[in-house]
Amino acid sequence: MAVVSAPAKPGTTWQRESAPVDVTDRAWVTIVWDDPVNLMSYVTYVFQKLFGYSEPHATKLMLQVHNEGKAVVSAGSRESMEVDVSKLHAAGLWATMQQDR
């Protein structure tokens, strides 16, 4: 939130003062981790059903999980990421959330 200072004299202009940045305003992300249990086709299916991703996008994320060990699958508020992690756990996937850097 910005604070506006009133002009000191007639004919002078006002100046905005920046408020300090609150680090809790940063976005959160949901990360899916590779696991030895779920089939790649199932992980792709879960991404499509839970997040509404197209098959090519869901496949790209699944391959990132498979090849790199993890992938960011969603971003947003802390509360919405908690919901996403919970849904992924219910689907049997390994997922965590963290504050985006």
From Swiss-Prot:
SUPFAM superfamilies: ClpS-like. One of its GO terms (biological process) is protein catabolic process. It comes from the Bacteria. Gene3D superfamilies: 3.30.1390.10. Binds to the N-terminal domain of the chaperone ClpA. Involved in the modulation of the specificity of the ClpAP-mediated ATP-dependent protein degradation. Belongs to the ClpS family. HAMAP family: ClpS. This is ATP-dependent Clp protease adapter protein ClpS. It comes from Mycobacterium tuberculosis (strain ATCC 25177 / H37Ra). The lineage of its organism: Bacteria, Bacillati, Actinomycetota, Actinomycetes, Mycobacteriales.
